[in-house]
A protein has these predicted regions:
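ATP-binding N-terminal substructure of ATP-dependent carboxylate-amine bond-forming enzymes
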Residues: 1-97
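Short glycine-rich anion-binding loops that position phosphate/pyrophosphate groups of nucleotides
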Residues: 16, 76-78, 146-148, 276, ...
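Hydrophobic anchor at the start of a short beta-strand
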Residues: 28-31, 92, 119-120, 141, ...
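A conserved helix-loop-beta module that forms one wall/lid of the active-site cleft
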Residues: 94-177, 183, 321
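Internal nucleotide-binding/catalytic subdomain
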Residues: 154-278
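Active-site "cap" helix and flanking loop/linker of ATP-utilizing ligase/carboxylase catalytic domains
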Residues: 235-257, 274-339
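Peripheral (often C-terminal) accessory segments that flank ATP-dependent C-N-forming ligase machineries
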Residues: 297-416
């Protein structure tokens, strides 16, 4: 498929600049929009993507709609817009209404149960007062902030009230007068390993090849390619089948990820649904592992089903952070020939140099492709050694632990 005369328009919230840039490898142009409507806009979001290797940063989304051959919306919080665009005949690739499975966790758990997936013990708690009581009475739960307050706190493990109280105090402070309106989804802590299915759904049909990955937040992700349904571990197939009715109902054609826990009983429990590109590692890997990436995105937008092409068996993304990046622009340097393998997060290019955009401490992921776990790990380490930034933090120990988790997962039926 020749897309060299096509124009792409990307509506992003700032995290998927590299995926927008990947389209430029095959398209005539890529216009990149990040919403910045604020009374007193800071220079940060206004600059994301500017000067970045041919990407054209635009200040208006609506003015460019009718010039685009297809539209790409990689993130969530955009369901109404994506559905409106579809309803008005625009070719758009985005999660749409199905994103509620991710954003409304209680809804997601409810649909999961209705679709026949096993469900761990789960409680819906409203307000910090009720949460304190729950935490005083219960131990060993994973607590997630739900509804419109997700941004005020990361999910956290609750073992006893003494350990969790400071986090609850923090949430109460951040929520202010709304502290009794915050909804929490409290889920039983489960034993076992936590792989994730990272795929593309076509209205409930999982497109092959697809991948499963083991991820450690702040460290990275190791992924393995599966060429067919027969090759895919049964646990991952069951998870996909449990989500498929939702994708079919919403006519979802997009990327998604589903993390699940599995132990020696080999029963998969869905932990998190990500109905968008999964950041940072999965999206970074997909942009290079999928050789016909632009064709796939174009097909998702236009209704032309296009199977992804993957010529490698394994992939790895290692995360790079810097404490300085949350405070100021951080210069990131690497050899020119490394550009394809360094996937920046919120970034700009100014006067020939690459910078991360504050206040986000995640700088980039360095990726590698290969035919064994050992190969992708060694290649990624060689590449990371060539990247420089102030206060650069890389968790190699986390990558080693992932390799141990892969071996454990094999005992539970996750062939890797």
């Amino acid at each position: 498929l020749n897309l060299s005369n096509k124009k792409a328009l990307v509506y992003d919230l700032g995290l998927f600049t590299e995926n927008a840039l990947r389209l430029l490898r095959d398209c005539a142009s890529v216009e990149y929009y990040v919403p910045t409507r604020e009374a007193f806009p800071a220079p940060y979001k206004v600059e994301i993507g500017s000067g970045l290797d041919g990407l054209e940063r635009v200040d208006s989304f609506e003015e460019h709609l009718d010039r685009a051959d297809f539209i790409f919306v990689p993130d969530t919080q955009c369901a109404a817009m994506v559905e409106w665009l579809r309803g008005h005949g625009y070719p758009v690739a985005g999660a749409g209404a199905a994103e509620r499975l991710e954003l409304d966790r209680w809804h997601g758990r409810t649909r999961q149960k209705e679709n026949g997936l096993p469900v761990q013990e789960t409680h819906r708690i409203k307000g910090v007062t009720a949460l304190r009581k729950f935490c005083a009475d219960r131990k060993d739960f994973y607590i997630k902030v739900d509804n419109n307050f997700r941004g005020i706190s990361e999910s956290f493990k609750h073992q006893d009230l003494r350990a969790s109280e400071s986090r609850i105090d923090y949430i109460a402070h951040k929520a202010g007068p709304y502290k009794e309106d915050v909804v929490f989804v409290c889920e039983e802590l489960l034993p076992g390993v936590e792989p994730g299915l990272d795929g593309i759904t076509w209205e409930g049909e999982l497109l092959y090849p697809t991948t499963i990955g083991y991820e450690s937040k702040g460290s990275g992700i190791i992924s393995r390619v599966y060429g067919s349904e027969r090759e895919l571990p049964e646990a991952a197939r069951l998870i996909d089948e449990g989500l498929a009715p939702e994708f079919k109902r919403h006519k979802t054609r997009f990327f998604y990820s589903a993390e699940f826990k599995i132990d020696k009983d080999r029963v998969p429990y869905l932990i998190d649904s990500t109905i968008r590109l999964a950041a940072p590692g999965v999206a970074a890997i997909q942009s290079e592992l999928i050789e016909n990436y632009t064709e796939v995105v174009y097909g998702l937008a236009t209704g032309e089903k296009t199977a992804p092409v993957m010529k490698h068996k394994y992939a790895l993304a290692i995360s790079m952070d810097s404490s300085e990046a949350s405070k100021t622009f951080v210069n990131i340097t690497f050899p020119k020939e490394m550009r394809r393998w360094v996937k920046l997060r919120m970034a700009v290019r100014h006067r020939g140099d690459y910078y991360s955009v504050p206040p986000f401490d995640s700088l980039a992921s360095v990726i590698s492709l290969g035919e064994s776990v050992r190969e992708v790990v060694e290649t990624a380490k060689e590449r990371i050694a060539q990247v420089e930034a102030i206060n650069l933090n890389i968790d190699f120990a986390g990558i080693e632990k992932l390799q141990e988790e892969i071996q454990e997962g094999k005992r539970y039926g996750i062939n890797f």
